[in-house]
Each structure stands twice: as structure tokens, then as C-alpha cells.
Design a protein with these regions (language model features):
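N-terminal Lys/Arg-rich, disordered targeting/topogenic segments
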Residues: 1-18
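Residues marking helix boundaries in flexible regions
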Residues: 7-11, 25, 64
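Hydrophobic H-region at the start of alpha-helical membrane spans
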Residues: 17-30
Length: 224
């Protein structure tokens, strides 16, 4: 009788262990799937369906982030954290941004921040990294106000979440009508075999009766 009871206990314990392992395996699989989807949701969108960012900078906040907010800013190890452009005095955070419901790339809520489109490449990665920054608000110059002054050979320095540095060299700049931006080109590296970084901001004039600038400036650079 005791032997049967012991066997029953052993069998029950074994079944419980198998069930526990199964639940753990399923849980880990779900976590992995969730992480994958979080990292690839925007990148799964074909570039020809992605629209250029809007120009809500005129209504974006112009309150400068505190020194502490900037210095304590953190992101995942492989994502862009800071952008530094020595020739035009840019030192800013790089926020992670996705797509709006209408297919436009979202933009930062503050004119002193920049935004990395998470459907584009990461620092040093094959393809092109895309970063957007505001040119101004109604009352202040934005982070990319002097972007038009960049010239070929200027450096753009990206600090990643793990503090690894990537230096890109400006190749050229293009200006597009606000409603005719070729996002396939903007989201592609200027040299197919070299990781790229393309920056965008608004330029030109404000369209009468709107808060929309009539042009977009894109700076193309590649990893040095």
C-alpha cells in the first residue's frame, strides 16, 4: 500500500514538474515574440508606404530640457542616445519614434529633442538611420535650425545606449517640396554598401494659414 502511495506521489510530482517546465517555456516564447514585435513593428512597413514627418514644431514645446534630464537619459544598448554635430553646435537627445496612424513618421514633442525613426537602421547597422529634428517653434530656434549650414565633410557623432561612438561624414544635402519627399531615398543609405545616417528638418516658408513649412531639408551622411 505504501509502495503504491509513494509511486503515486512520484508520478504526481513528475507531472507537476513537466507542467511547470512547459509553462516556463511558453512564457519565455511569448516574451521573445513580444520583444521581436516591439523591435520590428515599424521596420516591417515598406519604405514606399512611409510618409515624411509633419511640421508640428510650431506647436511643439520650446521649454529646454534640464541638464539633469539630458545627462540621465538612457536607451537600450544598441539604440541611438545622443547626437552631436560640432560644426553647428548640436548636442541633443535622440528619442525613439514610430509611425502615426496616417503613416507619417512621428516627431518629437520638444523642439530641442531629435527623433530616431525605429523603422530605420540602428547606429553602425547596414542601411540608413533616420533622425528628424525641428527647425523652430513660433518663439525659438529648434535643434536643427542650423542644419542648412552643414557642408560635405562635416562630422555627425552618434552615441549609442552603451556609449559606443559612431561618426558619420556629411556627403550632401537636398531640399524637397513638403508634399513630394521621396521617402525611399530618404530611408536609404547614400552608398549602398556603407551604413548611412540621414537627417531631416523643415525649411522654406510657413504656408499661409497653416503651421506647415513648404519644404524639407535632408542631409545625407555615411559612416566614416
Amino acid at each position: 500500500m505504501k509502495t503504491k502511495k509513494i509511486k503515486s506521489i512520484i508520478k504526481k510530482s513528475a507531472n507537476q514538474n513537466v507542467l511547470s517546465l512547459l509553462l516556463i517555456t511558453v512564457g519565455l516564447a511569448l516574451i521573445a515574440v513580444a520583444a521581436y514585435l516591439a523591435n520590428t513593428a515599424s521596420s516591417a512597413i515598406p519604405t514606399n508606404l512611409v510618409k515624411a514627418p509633419n511640421s508640428k514644431q510650431l506647436t511643439a514645446s520650446s521649454i529646454k530640457p534640464s541638464t539633469k534630464a539630458v545627462s540621465s537619459y538612457s536607451v537600450a544598448p544598441t539604440l541611438p542616445k545622443y547626437i552631436n554635430i560640432p560644426s553647428i553646435g548640436v548636442n541633443a537627445r535622440v528619442l525613439r519614434l514610430g509611425l502615426l496612424k496616417n503613416g507619417q513618421i512621428a516627431t518629437p514633442d520638444n523642439i530641442f529633442d531629435t527623433g530616431w525613426y525605429d523603422g530605420s537602421a540602428k547606429p553602425g547597422q547596414k542601411g540608413a538611420m533616420f533622425i528628424y529634428g525641428h527647425v523652430s517653434s513660433w518663439t525659438a530656434d529648434g535643434v536643427f535650425y542650423r542644419l542648412k549650414k552643414l557642408k560635405p565633410g562635416d562630422r555627425i557623432i552618434i552615441t549609442r545606449g552603451d556609449n559606443k561612438i559612431f561618426t558619420y561624414i556629411v556627403i550632401k544635402s537636398n531640399v524637397y517640396p513638403y508634399n513630394a519627399v521621396d521617402m525611399n531615398t530618404v530611408l536609404s543609405p547614400i552608398s549602398p554598401n556603407t551604413p548611412g545616417l540621414n537627417l531631416m528638418t523643415c525649411t522654406g516658408q510657413v504656408i499661409k494659414g497653416t503651421s506647415e513649412f513648404n519644404e524639407r531639408l535632408v542631409v545625407f551622411s555615411e559612416l566614416s
